[in-house]
Each structure stands twice: as C-alpha cells, then as structure tokens.
C-alpha cells in the first residue's frame, strides 16, 4: 500500500486530513505535514522524512505520494528534494478535498497501481472536483424542461 503525505503552508494539511477523515474514517497511512511561519524547506524535509518513517512502520510499500498546495512553494520544493532521488515517490500539486478523498479510496482499494497511475488519478480528481453552479443554470434547466 502506498503512503500519502499532504504538505501545505500553514495548518491546511492537518485540517484537510481531518475533514477527509469525517468521510473516510481514520487514516493511518496518510500524514499531514505543515510549514509554519519561521520554518524553511530544510525543516519541511525533516518532517517529510519523519512522516515517511511512520508510513513505513505502518506497512506502506515504499511508494509515497506527496500532495502539495502550491507548485513552487516551500512544501513542494522540499518534496522535490526527496522525489528526485526516489522513483517510487511522486508529487501532485493543487491538493483539495475531492483529490484527497479519491486518493484515499485508491489507497484503500490497494489495486497495485504504480505511483504514476495514482498521480494521474489525483490530477483527474482535482479537475473533476472543481464544479460551478449559478442561479442562471437552474433557469436554463427549467427552460429546457418546458
């Protein structure tokens, strides 16, 4: 089973994980890593390494998906430092609740997907999770029904 590390600016990762756990239940193989004011990429790398150790102790197979908030941000840059030397790691940016729920579901299914397949699922879930609604949409639907 692959591990998931959600790395973000501030406490967003912790709260996002808590919100997803309301739907998916407690997740032992998902770790939240924060970048708080005063910390830099070196601090985040250390937190990532500790999270990876915990994931391995929980039985993860060595594949790790980093879900970061911003491309080019410090949590992303810190993850890059680890991913560059390990082909079983990957990063997807733009983490959202629909994305994390989809990836937790894929993790629970444990279908043997490699990290690149999981990354593609994450990107698709992120795209599909962004939807729109406006009052004119309802009016247009009502007109179509007449």
Walk through the language-model features, giving the residues of each:
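N-terminal loops that bind phosphate or other acidic moieties
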Residues: 2-146
């Amino acid at each position: 089973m692959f591990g998931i590390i959600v790395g973000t600016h501030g406490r967003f990762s912790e709260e996002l994980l808590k919100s997803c756990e309301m739907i998916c239940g407690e997740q032992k193989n998902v770790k939240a890593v924060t970048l708080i004011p005063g910390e830099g990429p070196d601090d985040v790398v250390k937190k990532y390494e500790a999270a990876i150790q915990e994931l391995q102790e929980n039985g993860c197979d060595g594949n790790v998906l980093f879900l970061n908030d911003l491309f080019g941000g410090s949590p992303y840059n810190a993850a890059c430092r680890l991913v560059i030397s390990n082909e079983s790691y990957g990063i997807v940016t733009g983490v959202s609740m629909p994305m994390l729920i989809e990836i937790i579901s894929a993790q629970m299914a444990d279908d043997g997907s490699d990290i690149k397949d999981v990354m593609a699922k994450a990107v698709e879930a992120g795209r599909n999770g962004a939807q729109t609604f406006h009052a004119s949409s309802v009016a247009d639907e009502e007109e179509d029904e007449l």
